[in-house]
Amino acid sequence: MKSSCTINTKIVDIVLIGGGLMSATLGTYLQLLEPNWTIHMYERLENTAEESSNGWNNAGTGHAAFCELNYTPIQQNGSIDISKAILINESFEISRQFWSYLVKNNLLTNPQSFINNMPHINFVWGDENTRFLYQRFKALQCCTIFNGMEYSENHQQISEWAPLIMAGRNTYQKVAATRMLMGTDVNFGELTQQLLNSLQRNPQFHLYMKTDVVDIKRNNDNTWTIYTLNSKDSYSNTEVRSRYVFIGCGGRSLQLLQQSGLNEANNYAGFPVGGKFLVTNNPTIIKDHNAKVYGKAKIGAPPISVPHLDARILNGQKMLFFGPFATFSSKFLKYGSYLDFFQSITFKNMLPMLYVGKNNFNLVKYLISQLIMSETDRLDALCEYYPKASLKDWKIIQAGQRVQVIQKDKKTGGILQFGTKVIYSQDRTLSTLLGASPGASTAAYIMLELLDVMFKQYITSESWQRKLKEIIPSYGQILNGNLSLTNQIRSYTCEVLNLNYIKAMPS
């Protein structure tokens, strides 16, 4: 095997590691704000958006907190905490504004190729769960951004909303559902490809495929040297220096953070969890289900286990997914290495991992129960949401890998975090995105927050402020509680993205 080394002496403005939605979103922001900046993006696979950004690999495809019950947990005092749901919905509204600006300026095309109306429905059964859902519904009534949510315990009404989940169900079963017609389905793979196509129109943007980042080192002048290995070009090595670095390569981000030598890396470990889905494209079944139906995780199960019967539109074709069923692999990426997990273990993060294992026995038990599931077990789980389901209509697929963040904690030794977290170097020139859900849906918000931290000296400038307010009309404002602004923003994004607009009314 031949190998050569090329050293790029010119300092680039920013290196983006990973060819997924997060890097594409950050690159798009920066190209709009500083079109003359040099941006290098490195993707280790042959194609971009092949990991978690891919529509087949997402755990969920339209997180807006309308129907994800794990974002509204019950507090010890019995009340419902809606703070996370509010944040996620506000974040998704920023994503919609970001995409709308790009469509208006012909940087994204044919919005129906990546976003479509899809009602978001919650469905539960049993006295305790129906009480919880009603309590959640009432708690969200005070929120402008959840205006329009409907609640029903009527079998006939719920059957009209989602026929599949009610056909064949015991008519005496206690059930409840909520519905948000404002819900959407998003194809993040298509969205990522379009963002990258747009970025490549600028000669200052350089995309390197089949190029693996193997090391990151800080230089004395506070720049960074990125070492890459290109498997397409006789395994040639390249070194490039950059003022800024963003590590957004999914599960592999933790390993590169560790290689960067940052002290911040010592506070984190990762636990890989995969997922499988039952999928059907049977037109007879699909025509009767036009919604994303989310249930409630069973007692003792972790938040990542929320089951859903999820209509998705992939490459113009409607599909129906049910799951997820948890899987375990030591890979940090779907197309990663079985050594990923073991290579990420250090003397400094080993103890937090052990503490998390000890303190999260329910998670361990849940994973074991998922791993030993038979086809019949999976069908039984599906029949709870689709009573007339037959296994012959469904196939099982392996979805993507996610790496849950484990963080050192003085009190408990280690905490398993469900969500995304951005880690920064002390001088804010390098950042890393760790974690998973809600991820893609809130990408525009997460990257906007990242701009505020990494580019503090730029974001306060008049030119950046003016441009950001042009891209995100609600920039610097909160929608929730502001009925006029909520309607103004939603009316605008619905018109541009060809979505149905439902006006929020006074409570």
From Swiss-Prot:
<keyword id="KW-0285">Flavoprotein</keyword>
<dbReference type="GO" id="GO:0006099">
    <property type="term" value="P:tricarboxylic acid cycle"/>
</dbReference>
<dbReference type="GO" id="GO:0047545">
    <property type="term" value="F:2-hydroxyglutarate dehydrogenase activity"/>
</dbReference>
<keyword id="KW-0816">Tricarboxylic acid cycle</keyword>
<keyword id="KW-0560">Oxidoreductase</keyword>
<dbReference type="InterPro" id="IPR006231">
    <property type="entry name" value="MQO"/>
</dbReference>
<dbReference type="GO" id="GO:0008924">
    <property type="term" value="F:L-malate dehydrogenase (quinone) activity"/>
</dbReference>
<dbReference type="InterPro" id="IPR036188">
    <property type="entry name" value="FAD/NAD-bd_sf"/>
</dbReference>
<keyword id="KW-0274">FAD</keyword>
<comment type="similarity">
    <text>Belongs to the MQO family.</text>
</comment>
<comment type="pathway">
    <text>Carbohydrate metabolism; tricarboxylic acid cycle; oxaloacetate from (S)-malate (quinone route): step 1/1.</text>
</comment>
<protein>
    <recommendedName>
        <fullName>Probable malate:quinone oxidoreductase</fullName>
        <ecNumber>1.1.5.4</ecNumber>
    </recommendedName>
</protein>
<dbReference type="Pfam" id="PF06039">
    <property type="entry name" value="Mqo"/>
</dbReference>
